[in-house]
Design a protein with these regions (language model features):
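Acidic (Asp/Glu)-rich catalytic clusters
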Residues: 19-20, 63-64, 103-110, 136-142, ...
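Short, small-residue-biased leader/transition segments that mark boundaries at the very start
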Residues: 1-13
Length: 468
């Protein structure tokens, strides 16, 4: 194959990329780890939420393992529902704002992408567009935005609102929000900045575009005050399995984070969300489905089970009960018998995300006691927990990947940094041995490594509008 003189190696990467489909892997990190008792474990960094050296080490470990990206969840409020005792025993109360954190870590890494959560309910489109464009420039094309509408009904008080908006309104706003942000990222054509000292011309004003958006929720003039991001647009990620969430992903997202413990349910979700994309003029391969997996790794099955038992033994009952409060918000769970089933199964409260339906249905179907239910949620809040050897874990991942349940996974280490080190040292080589995962990064940007196309500007085929 002969490249034309104008086609760069960067542009040609999709031509030369291996044709065999391979896993996409993200490292989904939470301070001390995903298990609710992780901060008490000797393998954790106890002050990790505000320890930049810890995050540098974690990002470099993930990059050593050739992960596509690292991701931290975020909320514009404190993560807690429960009584004062559980509040005092909860290890996730203090943590960095993610875009700030990733801006710092982009200077300590070279290849790995950075996914930051930001809410379309409690952020502003112009400021968010500027923030993520800046991160994409700082990281040289490794930024991604995890679009959330914020399901927590405890946040509105931080923003002067009398109530948390209902889900339908939040998702309606989200669709418009994402469209505005993408339009702002296209404010400048890729070649708008001439920067020619000889002529004295810095910018071609014919290649600057004012958005002039007027919609139901936003009025945004533009242009943005930073040039087009290296990736065109930072990668758009979405997390949500409700019907509204699937529609938002089908319309706007390039990756979706989801939570399933059953392969059959994961397969149904995979077919459903990809099947919705055609009406938005999109192909199924333009969206990567990445379920969460929390691996507890041992060199033997007995060692892995022992590690899991050790973590479960660290759960204080008050912290365990606090994980159930979102599903039973109108009851005093301290009165419940921990070793009996919940006294009743409610309809999930308004505004609680789709995972609430999964959890309540599971508790009813399996006949879990209260203790068994919070122990089930303790590992990864309802995500898939796999306990076993590197070979067992690779078997499970391969099975889901090759049978239409996933395009890859969000790996959720139960304890940090210990569990991520184990995954990189033990599971990654097994996946590589099977040809399921890369042995080197393919490109320079997060889009390159995820196999996603760089989006054209919405103005590429239209006459340029002069900036006002």
């Amino acid at each position: 194959y002969t490249l034309s003189d104008t086609l760069s190696l960067h542009d040609a990467l999709p031509i030369f990329r291996m044709t065999r489909r391979q896993l996409r892997l993200g490292a989904f990190i939470m301070a001390t780890g995903h298990h609710i008792a992780a901060w008490r474990h000797p393998g954790s960094q106890i002050d990790s939420g505000i320890n930049i050296d810890h995050y540098v080490d974690v990002a470099r470990t993930a990059e050593r393992g050739l992960f596509d990206q690292v991701f931290v969840a975020d909320s514009p409020g404190v993560w807690h529902k429960g009584d004062e005792e559980s509040f005092s025993r909860q290890g996730r109360l203090s943590h960095f704002e993610p875009v700030t954190l990733w801006a710092a870590l982009s200077q300590a890494t070279r290849h790995i992408g950075f996914v930051a959560t930001a809410s379309t309910t409690y952020e502003d489109p112009y400021l968010l567009a500027r923030k993520f464009a800046s991160l994409d420039h700082l990281s040289k094309g490794r930024a991604a935005w995890n679009v959330v509408t914020t399901s927590a009904d405890t946040v509105h008080g931080n923003f002067g609102l009398g109530a948390h908006p209902d889900p339908a309104l939040r998702y309606e706003r989200a669709h418009e929000f994402v469209d505005v942000v993408k339009g702002l990222w296209d404010s400048f054509d890729d070649d708008a900045f001439v920067r020619d000292p000889a002529s004295g011309v810095y910018l071609d004003p014919a290649k600057v575009h004012t958005l002039n958006h007027v919609g139901k929720h936003f009025r945004v003039k533009g242009p943005l005050n930073i040039e087009r991001p290296p990736q065109g647009h930072p990668v758009i990620v979405q997390a949500g399995s409700s019907d509204d969430g699937k529609e938002l992903a089908a319309a706007t997202a390039e990756a979706i984070f989801t939570a399933w413990t059953s392969q059959a349910e994961a397969q149904a979700f995979y077919r459903d969300v990809k099947g919705r994309m055609g009406k938005y003029g999109r192909r199924p391969d333009e969206l990567l489905v990445l379920p969460g997996i929390s691996p507890v790794i041992g060199r033997t099955e007995a060692e892995a089970q022992g590690k899991w038992a050790e973590l479960q033994a660290l759960i204080h009952p008050s912290v365990g009960l606090a994980t159930l409060v979102p599903f039973w918000p109108n009851d005093d769970l301290r009165r419940w018998n921990l070793d009996a089933p919940p006294p009743y199964y409610p309809e999930p409260p308004k505004g609680v995300n789709s995972r609430a339906h999964v959890v309540i249905d599971l508790a009813r179907r399996e006949g879990y006691t209260v203790r068994q239910l919070y122990e089930y949620l303790a590992g990864a809040r309802g995500h898939w927990v796999v306990v076993g050897t590197p070979q067992t874990i690779a078997d499970q991942m391969q099975d889901w990947f090759e049978n239409g349940a996933a395009d890859g996974f969000n790996v959720m280490p139960p304890v940090l940094p210990q569990s991520l080190n184990e995954f990189v040292d033990l599971v990654i080589p097994e996946l590589q041995r099977r040809g399921l995962f890369r042995t080197a990064y393919e490109g320079r940007t997060l889009r390159d490594n995820l196999g996603l196309a760089r989006p054209a500007s919405r103005y590429a085929a239209a006459p340029a509008a002069r900036a006002a």
